[in-house]
């Protein structure tokens, strides 16, 4: 793995949650609550805030990653503040790395994708690794994107694999029979 900048020792990190399309807000909030309960037990965690179905306050990192656009019921995140770096034995990266598997396990139980997002040591980027797929038709682009996603998933040290392919939310259409409804 090529690394351009060393890991920093920041005072915070973020847990970004993507539930399946169409998930009710209450389910997203419940998942965030369970993730938050795990984090609250950690001695390095000073406090945390949860945001379900609404964007968290804009940070420089979030601005570049467009987290301010996250407003769907199936989207949530946790802003996690750590105790001062002089009052903890582990650096923020080590803490995030240690907690990631436990957080992902909770996410899996709720059918959620969970990403632990650290504040970068340098200028923020969309993601540490980005692959853009171009092609003449949507179906071909999506098929190639899914193959790339699978390859990334199977590569050691690549975590938080995601695509920008939007999942179709289930829909229900109701046809009101006005005559019956009035009676």
Task: Show the residue positions of the predicted features.
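Short, low-order "capping/linker" segments at domain edges
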Residues: 63-64, 125-134, 175-179
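Beta-strand-rich non-transmembrane domains
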Residues: 137, 142-183
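Short beta-strand-to-loop capping motifs
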Residues: 17-19, 80-84, 133-136, 176
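Transmembrane helices with small-residue packing motifs
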Residues: 1-23, 59, 63-65, 128
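Conserved hydrophobic/aromatic pocket- or pore-lining residues that grip, position, or stack substrates
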Residues: 15, 131, 152
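Solvent-exposed beta-strand sheet faces enriched in polar/charged residues
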Residues: 16, 49-51, 115-117, 164, ...
